[in-house]
UniProtKB/Swiss-Prot annotation:
Similarity annotation: Belongs to the amidase family. GatA subfamily.
Function per UniProt: Allows the formation of correctly charged Gln-tRNA(Gln) through the transamidation of misacylated Glu-tRNA(Gln) in organisms which lack glutaminyl-tRNA synthetase. The reaction takes place in the presence of glutamine and ATP through an activated gamma-phospho-Glu-tRNA(Gln).
EC number, UniProt record: 6.3.5.7
Keyword match Ligase: yes
Protein name (record): Glutamyl-tRNA(Gln) amidotransferase subunit A
Disulfide bridges in this chain: none
Organism: Brucella ovis (strain ATCC 25840 / 63/290 / NCTC 10512)
Pfam families in the record: Amidase
HAMAP family per the UniProt record, alphabetical: GatA
Catalytic reaction(s) noted: L-glutamyl-tRNA(Gln) + L-glutamine + ATP + H2O = L-glutaminyl-tRNA(Gln) + L-glutamate + ADP + phosphate + H(+)
GO biological process: one example: translation
Gene3D superfamilies: Amidase signature (AS) domain (3.90.1300.10)
Amino acid sequence: MSELTALTIAEARDKLKAKAITATELTDAYLSAIDAANDAINAYVAVTHDQARSMAKASDERIAKGEAGALEGIPLGVKDLFATKGVHTQACSHILDGFKPEYESTVTANLWADGAVMLGKLNMDEFAMGSSNETSYYGPVKNPWRAKGSNADLVPGGSSGGSAAAVAAHLCAGATATDTGGSIRQPAAFTGTVGIKPTYGRVSRWGTVAFASSLDQAGPIARDVRDAAILMKSMASLDLKDTTSVDLPVPDYEAALGRSVKGMKIGIPREYRVDGMPGEIEELWQKGIQYLKDAGAEIVDISLPHTKYALPAYYIVAPAEASSNLARYDGVRYGLRVPGKDIADMYEQTRAAGFGKEAKRRIMIGTYVLSAGYYDAYYLRAQKVRTLIKKDFEDVFAKGVDAILTPATPSAAFGLADEVLANDPVKMYLNDIFTVTVNMAGLPGIAVPAGLNGQGLPLGLQLIGRPFEEETLFQAAHVIEQAAGRFTPAKWW
């Protein structure tokens, strides 16, 4: 069965088309793999065995009739904050206990319309707040990768840790994820997978549990660049139910792969050389520069002067929006309800019991920066900084730069239950240092595996593109992937 789960989406698509395998066989292979591995990895918080099998059966019938969709019979995992009709959707928070939506998110509806099969819902940091997938009410996810000669558990990154771990461990062919400050790209880098955060407005947010509405964007995590391109084509669409959705045709992203990068201008930002960055990250970056240079790209030094303000500004804007978005969870209509002596007490008891520590921390920060006395000093200034960050990128792109190459993360995956990080949230927030600028500016960014560190753990590079020019990112990421190769963890689970 493992030879079926080893297939990429592109390979499985070809075999299904040629009738060499059936969607039912492929789905059963994944369900068996999940049943065998999930206790160890904890990537799934709900597995939809019956639904997966009936969707696979319907796919086989469509294939037989010659009516196959673009993702016909491909088994996918869904991050737990996409609404899936009648299926567990809790953003891995206790406050949404027992919640099963009456409707389907636009992203998942697009995937099912193209014939994809749902295997279940994937673990994540609570309300997508975290960089290690340790804030989930359902417990942490374990990274399928381990350091050479070590049995120590590592984090898969966050918030889309379940998505990245499931893809890396071959517990789904691909997965949906979301990215507010790096939640697709950082876990992809930590697990040797490919993750793209599309331009803000490219993929509908309708039916996705909101964290920070002006930053959130859904995208895929996949095993390679081609699979990410295939998934993104199905996920992206115009959606009138999302006022930020953009009316632009969705290109065939897969067609961009293999196109030459000769003459493409790649910017290298000097501000991304941060103090204390491990030598192996710098080395990897140089390697990526060389790969693109060898393929004919022109490398230019650039400056993004406001980079150093991105992280503090992000941790004002994102919690501010979160405190507003999370105000709706009160125990009245759905989810957890803890009885109280009156309605105000019921609200308090429900929210106290329902939200985890990190969600509470961000709600408090957000409420503080939006309060009358501090709104101008913090929130307003952070929004001004955001405008300056966006302008930095606009200036660089105006000079003819096609894409920007940076590291994806400041380190490889770190240990589960790391005491230093547990006691110092700011240190944990530094994981997003290379990724938040992309969300602040609403740009597309892709993380692609580019090598292993000295301990045999995957490291990723990030490419940042012009708005709605994801094709350029796929094109350049494919060049890096071809040069660096693909990386799969040794099975221990």
